[in-house]
Design a protein with these regions (language model features):
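Charged, solvent-exposed interaction patches on well-folded alpha/beta domains
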Residues: 1-46, 50-78, 82-262
């Protein structure tokens, strides 16, 4: 027995087509009104965290603006920004947010560059916060003529950023200050740590340096584990902190070298 095919009556099909056509015309009319009405012409542009001017947006229809293109164009001119966000505020206002990169260290070249956790270089602004950041040494022979806003993929940068991240997240090391990181040679990579205030109070700062601390030779690989070992060693050597010259974590058994000990 053959199955009967279900067919819509022609009248219903005709009505559906008319409804869809009317709906399309209505949408087109609404879009035309939105994109041509003076009511939606941009009258105010609010720029935050930047002195850039976007006066050229005024008078343009707020719905005609391609915010992705505007954002990409603005980002090209702001290497110290991780993102430039454009927001429509109906009926006639545009807000432009410049979201700045957060520096985690300074990198030493012929001058110092700030670097964020993603490894992007940008020009420092000279704030007090930046003055307390660790300085990365040893990149000047690996990267020639660094450009702001560019991310350089180098194992030396990855190692330095990993050290900074794990040092911050280690609760045992929280009272210490990470002063510098040297990645000139990955196998011999190291960092210099300043003692916490309570330890420094027991001794006089080194005259030629003005601060007291010690070197940590960490090498490459297993950064998190090595810094955990470092934290444990410092807890054990709490009374000898000011007498530590360097700690070598590159080998199976850590080595602690004290000052004035041959």
């Amino acid at each position: 027995m053959k199955k009967k095919k279900f067919k819509l009556p022609l009248m219903i099909i005709f009505i559906l087509v008319i409804i869809l056509l009317a709906f399309s015309i209505l949408l087109g009319y609404i879009w035309k009104v939105l994109t041509t009405s003076e009511f939606f012409a941009v009258k105010q542009v609010i720029v935050r965290q930047s002195g850039e001017s976007f006066e050229y947006l005024k008078g343009k229809n707020i719905f005609d603006l391609n915010l992705n293109i505007e954002s990409s164009r603005a980002l090209l001119n702001c290497p110290d920004c991780r993102k430039v966000r454009f927001l429509r505020i109906l009926p006639n206002c545009v807000i432009v947010d410049f979201l700045k990169r957060k520096p985690v260290a300074l990198a030493k070249f012929y001058k110092k560059y700030a670097i964020d956790q993603q490894g992007v270089f940008f020009s420092p602004v000279g704030t007090a916060e930046e003055a307390d950041l660790p300085v990365i040494y040893g990149l000047e022979t690996k990267i020639f003529g660094p450009k702001p806003g560019v991310r350089y993929k180098r194992p030396e940068i990855d190692l330095a950023l990993s050290i900074i991240k794990e040092f911050k997240s280690n609760s045992t090391l929280r009272s210490f200050v990470l002063k510098k990181i040297d990645v000139t040679n990955l196998q011999g990579a190291g960092l210099f740590v300043l003692l916490p205030n309570q330890a420094v109070n027991y001794i006089k700062p080194v005259p030629q340096l003005g601060w007291v601390g010690f070197e940590v030779r960490i090498g490459e690989g297993s950064v998190k584990q090595k810094l955990m070992i470092l934290g444990g060693l410092l807890m054990q050597a709490n009374k000898e902190l000011a007498n530590i010259k360097y700690i070598d974590l590159r080998f199976k058994e850590p080595v602690i070298k004290l000052n004035n000990v041959k």
